[in-house]
Curated annotation (Swiss-Prot):
Role played: As part of the heterotrimeric replication protein A complex (RPA/RP-A), binds and stabilizes single-stranded DNA intermediates, that form during DNA replication or upon DNA stress. It prevents their reannealing and in parallel, recruits and activates different proteins and complexes involved in DNA metabolism. Thereby, it plays an essential role both in DNA replication and the cellular response to DNA damage.
Zinc fingers (C4-type) by residue: 464-486
Residue range(s) of DNA binding per entry: 179-252
One of the record's GO cellular component terms: nucleus
Protein name: Replication protein A 70 kDa DNA-binding subunit
Subunit structure: Component of the heterotrimeric canonical replication protein A complex (RPA).
Protein's gene: RPA1
Localization annotation: Nucleus
Region (Disordered): 131-152
GO molecular function: damaged DNA binding; single-stranded DNA binding; single-stranded telomeric DNA binding; zinc ion binding
GO biological process: DNA replication; DNA-templated DNA replication; double-strand break repair via homologous recombination; meiotic cell cycle; nucleotide-excision repair; telomere maintenance via telomerase
Main location: nucleus
Sorted UniProt keywords: DNA replication, DNA-binding, Metal-binding, Nucleus, Phosphoprotein, Zinc, Zinc-finger
Species for this entry: Drosophila melanogaster
Listed transmembrane segments: none
């Protein structure tokens, strides 16, 4: 067994600001420290054989090495990436060594003892601190920049900012007053507004990333107006003088115990030269459109495609908030000969120009499942790039311009409406005979059927009034309703429909369930009207429900076996309903007759 030699005396040089490449050190102790938020942090005692430093921290991404027992006492490690940061009021406190990447050279079980008799680096002799030839390192200080002159206050750095060395995101905590981070914007939300009893306002949020980690930042009201147009996704900025507080994990899934809030003193400057201290690029895990059909509902996905079709801008008003929303559906195609619908919202929908059929790259877009197909929706944490300068985009452009998008074989997104028969046509008896729904994933089919019976009992429930929540509320009395999901009390609620009915075709009858939107379409009334009638006007409710009896429709059905207690039931759910398009339906019947009789089609 050969033990690596420690980089003797190097700790004193590092802690006094010198850049040293890949120092080899020994871990003498490691201890979990208390954190003000729900996050693990580890402090280590580290030695170079001559000096030790008790103010060293592991970045959170290295916690797994501690959990796996790789960083035991006496382990010899090589520091691959690290930074030093001043912690304390006005930057006058202790300098902390933060390690973001390391390599285990010799496990502690091999070393078995402390190497040398190290003393604190603060006792280092002056000769140990003499300048040494610097080598390239990942912890290079940022050169101080001349202040820029701009009429927008706080948009650029000024003389009050100590830009001599940036701080890693992983080192930030509410106990620091002076710091500057250099970070890339990985995502940026649209402007969101709110209005309640305490007032009204607006906000937007962004996710920031450097080599050490990531953090969420939010700008409210005046800061929202000041910084929204300045901040651009994928650009790198110096940012300072934000407020730090424990992260609200209900709204952020980032691996950081804290989040930032912009204040009136916040300073932001675009970093135009990132060569000296590179910030990681945004990474894309691009998935072919054809693969999206096999992915889970609500999963996030990165993909790239050509915008082949652009839908009209649509506006609608939320019933509960009376807030207007705008959206636009576009169709993307790619070299897997597949197409998928992507929904844009807000300003993205209003400003989108697809007449030149650009390349569209999306990151973190959400998969929605509807009518047996999959579509994409650009959410607040998603990124959309138009004609990105990457090899995949250039290759896709060449494919499309040479006729590649002319024959798309696979439409991943479901088509809606009474005239579409892309889903397999089947009778209710055939669906049962073929044992649909018994696999791991649900099956889908459609049929023409008549409504026989509609149950009024339990046809609705009281739901959370928030536009993005449909959870059932609990009546607390005194006109107060609690939503467990939102963990909030509301003075009102909204009705949601859950209708069970018996439908039949010429082969069989089945009980099916339909949810809110389908129920409203079938009954011809809003859920609010139906709920109020069921609770307050039984005669009107009877009229609404009886009008549905003995009406025929095209039903698109989802079929899946579900377990209730120790019993398995085959459940049918109405995914969509449409009036009968007799011309299209007759075409289907003629095709069935031709297949049954073997008679070819005639003109």
């Amino acid at each position: 067994m050969v033990l690596a030699s420690l980089s003797t005396g190097v700790i004193a040089r590092i802690m006094h600001g010198e850049v040293v490449d890949a120092p080899v050190l020994q871990i003498l102790a490691i201890k979990k420290i208390n954190s003000a938020a729900d996050s693990e942090r580890y402090r280590i005692l580290i030695s170079d054989g001559k000096y030790f430093n008790s103010y060293a921290m592991l970045a959170s991404q290295l916690n797994v090495m501690q959990h796996n027992g790789e960083l035991e006492e006496f382990t010899i490690v090589q520091l691959d990436k690290y930074v030093t940061s001043l912690v304390g009021k006005d930057g006058a406190g202790k300098r902390v060594l933060i390690i973001s990447e390391l390599t285990v050279v010799n496990p502690g079980a091999e070393v078995k003892s402390k190497i040398g008799e190290p003393v604190t680096y603060e006792n280092a002799a002056k000769q140990d601190l003499a300048p040494k030839p610097a080598v390239t390192s990942n912890s290079k200080p940022i050169a101080k920049k001349e202040p820029s002159h701009n009429n927008n206050n706080n948009i650029v750095m000024n003389s009050s900012i100590n830009s001599g060395m940036t701080h890693p995101i992983s080192s930030l905590s509410p106990y620091q007053n002076k710091w500057v981070i250099k970070a890339r914007v990985t995502s940026k939300s649209g402007i969101r507004t709110w209005s309640n009893a305490r007032g009204e306002g607006k906000l937007f949020s962004m996710d920031l990333m450097d080599e050490s980690g990531e953090i969420r930042a939010t700008a409210f009201k005046e800061q929202c107006d000041k910084f929204y147009d300045l901040i651009q996704v994928d650009s790198v900025y110096y940012i300072s003088k934000c407020q730090l507080k424990p992260a609200n994990k209900q709204y952020s899934s980032l691996n950081n115990a804290y989040e930032m809030t912009f204040s009136g003193e916040t300073v932001v400057q675009l970093c135009e030269d990132t060569d000296d201290d590179p910030i990681p690029e945004i990474k894309y895990n691009l998935v072919p459109i054809s693969d999206v059909s096999g992915m889970e509902n609500k999963a996030a996905v990165d993909t790239i495609g050509i915008c082949k079709e652009v839908g009209e801008l649509q506006s609608f008003v939320a019933r509960t908030t009376n807030k207007e929303f705008k959206k636009r559906d576009i169709t993307l195609v790619d070299m897997s000969n597949s197409a998928i619908s992507l929904t844009l919202w807000g300003d993205d929908a209003v400003n989108f120009d697809g007449h030149v059929q650009p390349v569209i790259l999306v990151k973190g877009t959400r998969i929605n499942e509807f009518n047996g197909g999959k579509s994409l929706s650009l959410g607040g944490g998603s990124i959309m790039k138009i004609n990105p300068d990457i090899p995949e985009a250039h290759k896709l452009r060449g494919w499309f311009d040479n006729g590649g998008g002319d024959s798309v074989a696979n439409m991943v997104s479901a088509r809606t409406g009474g005239g579409s028969f892309s889903t397999e046509w089947m009778t209710l008896k055939d669906a049962r005979a073929r044992n649909l729904g018994s696999g791991d994933k649900p099956d889908y089919f459609q049929c023409k059927a008549v409504v026989h019976i509609v149950k009024q009992e339990n046809a609705f429930y009281r739901a959370c009034p928030q536009s993005d929540c449909n959870k059932k509320v609990v009546d607390e009395g005194n006109d107060q309703f609690r939503c467990e999901k939102c963990n909030a009390l509301f003075p009102n609620f909204k009705y949601r429909l859950l209708i069970n009915m018996s439908i039949g075709d010429w082969t069989s009858n089945r009980w099916v369930s339909s949810f809110n939107e389908v129920g409203e379409q079938l009954l011809g009334h809003t859920s609010q009207e139906v709920g109020e009638a069921l609770e307050n006007d039984p005669a009107k409710a009877e009229q609404i429900f009886s009008a549905l009896n003995f009406t025929s429709h095209i039903f698109k059905l989802r079929c899946k076996n579900e377990v209730y207690g120790d019993m398995t039931r085959n459940k049918l759910t109405v995914q969509s309903v449409a009036p009968i398009n007799h011309k299209e339906y007759n075409k289907h019947l003629l095709k069935e007759l031709q297949e049954l009789t073997g008679i070819g089609s005639s003109n």
